[in-house]
Regions:
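Short, charged low-complexity linear motifs
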Residues: 1, 35, 100-102
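Short, aromatic-enriched amphipathic alpha-helices that serve as compact interaction elements
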Residues: 2-25
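Exposed alpha-helical structural elements
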Residues: 6, 10, 37, 41-45, ...
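Hydrophobic beta-strand residues in large extracellular and virion-surface proteins
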Residues: 14, 78, 90-92, 105-107, ...
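A structured, charge-rich N-terminal accessory region that forms the first stable segment of a protein
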Residues: 17-58
Length: 132
């Protein structure tokens, strides 16, 4: 499997896991006992798919969820890709009520596995760091 295909597969699996978590979180965040469970589940998702960078994982602290969801595959398609050495960039377009945002995920490869290393969004021609 090529690095680009591995990167896509990793990102799509991450997005599916996050979408499931977001759906569950919208129903469960009001209950304090559920918050700990949701935090543990989110940490497990990040551990499985992401490099351990605090900037990526801010959602573990806030447990925030937006609606419409951030990781619904049907509304956040991969629209482009670039391969550069040991990393692949995957671009996702989000459309919220007519407002389009382009996100870029940097995927790196270690020990035969693809990892999410960075998420950014395009603002006025510049890439700005974003948390997951």
């Amino acid at each position: 499997m090529t690095h680009t295909n591995l990167a896509k597969e990793t990102l799509l699996q991450f997005m599916q896991a996050m979408y499931s978590w977001e759906r569950k979180a919208t129903r469960s965040l009001r209950n304090q006992a559920d918050k700990e469970m949701l935090k543990d589940e989110l940490a497990a998702i990040f551990d499985q798919f992401c490099r351990s960078k605090k900037t990526l994982r801010e959602r573990e602290v806030s447990l925030s969820v937006r609606f419409p969801f951030d990781y619904k595959l049907e509304t956040h398609p991969i629209v482009d890709e670039e391969y550069d050495g040991n990393q692949t960039y995957l671009y996702i377009k989000e459309n919220r009520s007519g407002l389009e945002t382009l996100y870029r995920f940097r995927m790196v490869f270690q020990k035969g596995k693809g990892w999410i290393d960075k998420k950014e969004w395009l603002d006025d021609g510049k890439w700005i760091n974003s948390s997951l």
